[in-house]
């Protein structure tokens, strides 16, 4: 299906669903503005990372956006939803206006069908405070795709709720056309959760993405056929018509992430421990037996529902420096090595979308490349990260602190990595506050201070002012 056919599909899906619904649905909307007033080469890192590419990288900018959403109700067996967000940025050398979200979704019992560009969070990391998942974060804007998935976890029959599963399958389009026209996305995930009503639950999941198809200026056409889709789905090598690299390895660019987590849920304390890894090369082993076991994201998430002054925080450590060792070989003795996370030599944009890293944003987005290249050039990183939030009277706050060591770039097949003695240190910090305006109903103002200090993103400092109006109407 071409993306131009998605809009009629959205209209048909909404129209059909409207006829099946009872009245008293609600639609939420918002109108927002934000001013970034700063000094330095960029807007501070934390002011743009994990924001779905909503804001400009310029140190001084104005951002405007409006949203309309109708959410699916879990209590209904049949329901529909949709969302639209229009964003705009104005800076000294930049003016951009774009649809950040445009989607429709339908629900039939425990299954959802999503069509379009929808902001989503994939993985078992903390959805609000994390630095970002290893495979998917909230850093890039969503690409258009068609997805079918369960509506969250569903109980397995005859297990009395102690065993639950969730999963999904997506087909998407990289319509930024960076070096390859009509590049496609394949994504699927499956999770299992054990524990049910017990206070301790264990979850394990696996995610698989592949970039494939399209027409490359360097490698020519990469045909979109059912045979190739079968090879992509199962991670098999390419046929005789594929490039030599895809015949030796797997067809397309594949990345797998395994997630393992433990959750403790008490009345006044909710704790989650999570571990995520990446696999770029075969064989795929269980998360605790991979050759790059030193790499991944480890997180602790704590919720204190009854303690408003400090009711949530996250501590995370991430490393991508092991990369299974320096050697990338397929001689039957040594597998993997020089993994080159997010990098693929045949796909100029690598694992990014519209210049923004799709995975963890500390593997720097191509927008930071001074030479204008479209590749990810900093994928050897160690990150120490904290984020917490709370409420004092009517003022909400969120504090984020991050320290990173950036070692540069490792690509597959080089047999060597950059020197681990020479790296760029970076400290990033941000304090955000917000409060409702008493004299203007449904309106909230925000004030933040954000900054960077170090050699990776230079020294940046900004004061960020925002205002937001939110409303609801029923029908």
Model feature map: region roles:
Residues 121-221:
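Internal, well-ordered domain-core segments that constitute the primary functional module
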Residues 196, 200-263:
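A conserved mid-domain beta-alpha-beta active-site/ligand-binding segment of alpha/beta enzyme cores
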Residues 1-25, 468, 473-475:
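Bacterial Sec-dependent N-terminal signal peptides
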Residues 21-28, 69-81, 94, 107-111, ...:
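Short loop/turn motifs that connect adjacent beta-strands in outer-membrane beta-barrel proteins
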Residues 20-120, 127, 136, 142-154, ...:
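Beta-barrel outer-membrane channel/assembly domains of diderm bacteria
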Residues 246-257, 265-475:
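Outer-membrane beta-barrel pore domains
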Residues 41-48, 93-97, 125-132, 176-185, ...:
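Outer-membrane beta-barrel translocator domains and adjoining extracellular loop/strand segments
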